[in-house]
């Protein structure tokens, strides 16, 4: 009886190994499938992360490109108007698109979409970045038509006026505030028929006229120079055009813009919006010509005659004028020890000429606080 019972048990255990083997195979297959799926997901996630990074890099390239190639034409865009730029490829599979919006107070919002493209040109990843910008307008301490760290000597038939004056025939100028005629760290001396007027006419022995009043804006603007000219004599500055249709020829180093406006004769309209920043690391002598913008002279400036300039003149050395027909409308700042304005020149303070010279010549820079944003669509 016992032998029969054991035989029956052995017969009941037949096939158990096969069942266990099948169960083990199913478990192993499930584990392999799980590992495979997890690996596939991790690989897909890695690819997505790489593509997202590449799209972000394309967007960053768009941000940097706008700053590196800033055009002063952007400075005059309409307020709160979106200006879209053509898409640009970055390498074989990256692309960015830029939209620039001008806001009030000389500020801008730059939005950039970066795309990573697939082999067929389809978009496989997109990232949006933004940056707040502002025009890099330096802090100019202009409180007079002529500002000198040393004394000012005026002679001949010179007229220096701090009463706000628009350049001849310019339109669209907002009303300004009258300034002093001359402001200096020493005395202002007028001889002969010279006239220094303003509100007040003179500010003398001003102890606040330290070096930084002149060097700080000079160095800021120097870094944005449109024309860098060696020291020397320059004659016959006049606006010129090139190409067809004609456009202002900024490559001509004697083209300093067009300060004239209709109905004056010989107006070169293509250059009326060209306000270059002209920088010389040496001393300059200018004679017979016209221009507008910002003139920076690290050495001495000698104005010989028949020279007309609308905008800002900053001289780190001495300033001398002679002859007739010289006229500066805007502001003159000089840090040298000798300021002698004689002959028959005119120096008129003009808030309009100053504002346009800055607006049409400076470039943009990121806001120091909260300049960068990432947009989420």
Residue ranges and their predicted role:
Residues 101-240, 245, 270-377:
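Short, ordered "entry" segments at domain starts
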Residues 12, 72, 350-351:
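Polar helix-capping/helix-linker motif
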Residues 20, 39-40, 44, 64-67, ...:
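Charged, amphipathic alpha-helical interaction segments
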Residues 1-14:
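N-terminal leader/signal peptides at the extreme start of proteins
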Residues 16-58:
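Aliphatic-rich helix starts adjacent to a transmembrane/signal segment
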Residues 246-276:
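Eukaryote-specific, low-hydrophobicity, charge-rich regions
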Residues 53, 57-111, 232, 248, ...:
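Low-complexity, Gly/Pro-rich coil/beta segments used as flexible assembly/activation regions
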């Amino acid at each position: 009886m016992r032998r029969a019972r054991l035989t029956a048990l052995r017969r009941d255990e037949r096939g158990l190994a096969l069942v266990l083997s099948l169960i083990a195979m199913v478990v192993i297959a499930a584990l392999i499938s799980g590992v495979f799926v997890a690996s596939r997901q991790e690989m897909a996630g890695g690819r997505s992360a790489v593509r997202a990074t590449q799209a972000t890099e394309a967007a960053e390239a768009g941000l940097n490109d706008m700053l590196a190639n800033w055009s002063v034409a952007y400075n005059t865009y309409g307020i709160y108007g979106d200006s879209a730029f053509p898409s640009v490829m970055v390498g074989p599979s990256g692309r960015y698109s830029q939209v620039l919006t001008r806001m009030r107070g000389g500020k801008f919002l730059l939005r950039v979409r970066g795309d990573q493209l697939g082999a067929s040109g389809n978009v496989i990843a997109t990232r949006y970045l933004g940056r707040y910008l502002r025009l890099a307008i330096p802090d100019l301490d202009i409180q007079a038509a002529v500002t000198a760290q040393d004394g000012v000597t005026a002679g001949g038939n010179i007229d220096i006026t701090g009463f706000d004056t628009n350049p001849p025939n310019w339109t669209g100028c907002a009303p300004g505030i009258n300034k002093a005629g001359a402001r200096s760290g020493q005395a202002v001396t007028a001889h002969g028929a010279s006239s220094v007027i303003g509100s007040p006419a003179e500010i003398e022995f001003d102890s606040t006229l330290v070096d930084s009043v002149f060097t700080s804006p000079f160095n800021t603007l120097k870094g944005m120079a449109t024309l860098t000219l060696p020291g020397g004599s320059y004659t016959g500055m006049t606006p010129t055009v090139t190409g067809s249709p004609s456009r202002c020829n900024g490559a001509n180093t004697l083209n300093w813009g067009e300060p004239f406006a209709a109905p004056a004769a010989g107006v070169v309209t293509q250059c009326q919006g060209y306000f270059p920043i002209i920088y010389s690391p040496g001393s300059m002598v200018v004679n017979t010509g016209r221009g507008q913008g910002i003139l920076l002279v690290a050495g001495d400036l000698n104005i010989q005659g028949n020279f007309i300039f609308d905008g800002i003149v900053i001289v780190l050395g001495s300033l001398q004028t002679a002859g007739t027909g010289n006229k500066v409308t805007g502001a003159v700042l000089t840090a040298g020890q000798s300021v002698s304005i004689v002959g028959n020149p005119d120096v008129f303070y003009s808030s309009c000429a100053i504002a346009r010279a800055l607006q049409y010549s400076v470039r943009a820079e990121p806001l120091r606080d909260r300049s960068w944003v990432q947009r989420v669509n």
